[in-house]
Each structure stands twice: as structure tokens, then as C-alpha cells.
Amino acid sequence: MPGAGGKKKSPWASGERRPHFFKVLVGDFKQRLKIPPNFCKHIPWEESRKAKGLKEASMAATLEGPSGRTWLVVIRRTAEGTFFTSGWPKFVQDQALRELEFVVFRYDGNTRFTAMVFDRTACEREDLMGGGGGDRPRKKRGRPRTAAASRDAARPKKDSVGKEMVTYRASPSGGQPLQIVDSSWTPEPGSTAVKNEEDADELPVCELPASSASPPRHVPEGALDADGGAARRGAAKTRSLQDDLALASIPPSIRRYKGYVSRRRAVATAERQRATEIAHAFRSPLPYCVIRMSTMHVYYSFMMRFPTGFSRQHLPRERTDVVLRDPGGKVWSVLYIPNTRDRLSRGWCAFARGNCLEEGDYCVFELVAAAEFRVHIFRVVEPAVPAVRLRRVTVTCGRGPT
């Protein structure tokens, strides 16, 4: 096992005695893994009022791999036995587990497990001890990629003046992916543009006049200054105004609001189902509610509504500031407004963006005090990628944004 000298210390180096079990990977281990019946006495079903006494029940658990990376899995009890189910196939895939290898599990309490993987020679899989997540390199068909090509692919795409471009899946009539180019234009003093810390990730959506059918032009930065002055700091920079930025080319779902647009990759149906299963497997003796994040919750509007039955029973009937404690322990103050639709308002946007919430993610709001929630986040896609903010800007050739 790796020891000192720069290598990761084994997570098993602990003097505390904790329950263990091991499993040889055979049969349908890629889909689910059975937990030994005699070990199930350590699983705290009795702490869940809904699961206690039921023949079939589920609960969420955390599985830590050899590298320290964690996976969310579901423990499901059925008539056949108790299994790791949803989330387990992802662990198998990410750790590149193979038949006849075996895994030793240690139970750390509070539905947390730590896993150690051994190969067919009965030796520990030291390739999984690295901090990068433990994935084995996957070979692809075709010519091998050079190191330079790999680095270039990892870099964000940029235009001719070095501005990062965000590519959307929607395409204009020309068939090319729609790209929105980051602009360094800043509004005049006293304008109504929002000025806060969120503007750092803000991208303008340029609206070109309908009569503009000319090819892409390069406009000197100084020409875009509202006062017609020289270019800022005398820098000889140019900005490219592409016709594919015309407002008509942007999907209605994007241009209808001054909100945020996701930059995550395409999401598979199985990933959405996994997040749903894990979130609904959550159990706690405290009051809680499970809410799927919609576009209104995380991209625009930013009003998060509670189920009426939950809020009327557990929350005050007057405006009050409540505390949201995210999975990292950070505390957020959010305004709660009771009305016909009880909701979180001011401060919710900061929480949603600060935690990179996306449509389809699940939040479990666990009420730990009169006005304090512990928020558990179950994501559709890991790792989280911050969304980008859009604001509408009309550009007339030779004149500044209006």
C-alpha cells in the first residue's frame, strides 16, 4: 500500500474498529451489488420512520473510493436482499472494475462507506489511489492524440481577440453552432445595468439591426464608447460582431429573459433517472421536502416555491429570513415569503448560482431549526459547471450599445 513519501495515505489507517465486508465481483455486479445479510444490521433503517418495518425500502448513501472521491448510491432492501443499486453502476464504470476483482467495504457510520479495490492477483489497485478520480485511461480507436493536441482540446475556444466563446446546442439557419462571444463592454455610469459581483460571468447577447446583412465586421473598441472617445487605455483592440449573434438566431428559450444559460454537456435520460432515485431515497427523522430544480428556479426569475403542505405545516406565516446551509457548510441568508405560493425570494439567486444548480438537479431541504435548512444537492451531472449570464444589448453599426 502507498505510504509516506509523497503518496496518498491509505484511508484505512485508523485505530478505530469499524465493520467491514468484502465482495468478489461476479454475475451482474455492474448493475447492483448485494450486501451480506449479516452486515445489514449496521444499516440504520430504524432511523427512518418511513423505512422502519417495511419489507421494501431505500435510502441514500455515500461511497468513497480509494482516491477520496465520493459517489452517491442507493441502498435498496427487497425480498431478494439488500443491494447497492442506483449510483453503483457509475462507481463501477468510473473505477473500471472487472470481473473477479474484489472490493472491501468499510462502514463509517451515517450511511457512509469507504471502498478498497483489489485486482485478480489479490493486490491492491494502486492506480486508483491518485487524486484524479481513479479512472483508468480509456483507449480510443484511431490515431493516438499527441500531448499538444490534448492540451489544445482542453482549452476553451476563443475568437481572434482572445475572448472565450460559449457554444450552444441550438444552431441558426446556416447550420453552424451558435456562439456568443464574451465582450468587455461596460455600460455608461448611471445606466440601469445591474452592477454586482455576478457580472463577472455576464455575456451580452448582441442584437443587430434587421437591415444589417453585411459580412462580419471588425469594429475598433473605441468606436463603441458612448462618448465617442479614444479606445480604452489606448489599446489597439478590435471586437468581432458576428451575424450569427442576431437576436432572431437565438432560441426563444434563451432570448426571452435576462438570465443564465447552462454550459454543461448534454444529459442522458439515465442520468436524470439516477438523480431522481437518489434524491427520493433520502431519509431523515427531521421534516424535509424534495424539490426538482426547474429553469425558473435556477436560470431566471429565481423564486423557489415550497410544496404548500410542507410550508404550511413547518414554516412561519410571516416574512422572515431563513438560513440555508449548503453541502459545503456555507451559510446563505434567504428571504422566505408566505403567500398563496410560499417561496424563497431575495438571496435564492445567490444560493443557486453559488452552488451551480442546474435544471433537473434535486435539492432536499431538511429543516434542522425553526428557520434553518440543511440543503442536500443531488446533481444530474458531475462536476458542476457555472452557468453563464446573458443580458440583451442592441448594437448599431458605428454606434455603441443601446
UniProtKB/Swiss-Prot annotation:
Bias class Polar residues marks the residues at 173-186
Annotated InterPro entries: B3_DNA-bd, DNA-bd_pseudobarrel_sf, REM16-like
Gene Ontology terms, MF aspect: DNA binding
Q: Where is this region: Disordered?
A: 126-203
Give the coiled coil ranges.
none
Location within or outside the cell? Nucleus
Which residue intervals are the DNA-binding region? 18-121, 289-381
Q: Name one GO cellular component term.
A: nucleus
SUPFAM superfamilies from the UniProt entry: DNA-binding pseudobarrel domain
Q: What is its main location?
A: nucleus
Q: Where is the composition biased (Basic and acidic residues)?
A: 152-162
Identify the keywords attached in UniProt to this record, alphabetized.
Answer: DNA-binding, Nucleus, Repeat, Transcription, Transcription regulation
Pfam families per UniProt: B3
Name it: B3 domain-containing protein Os01g0723500
Which species is this UniProt entry from?
Oryza sativa subsp. japonica (Rice)
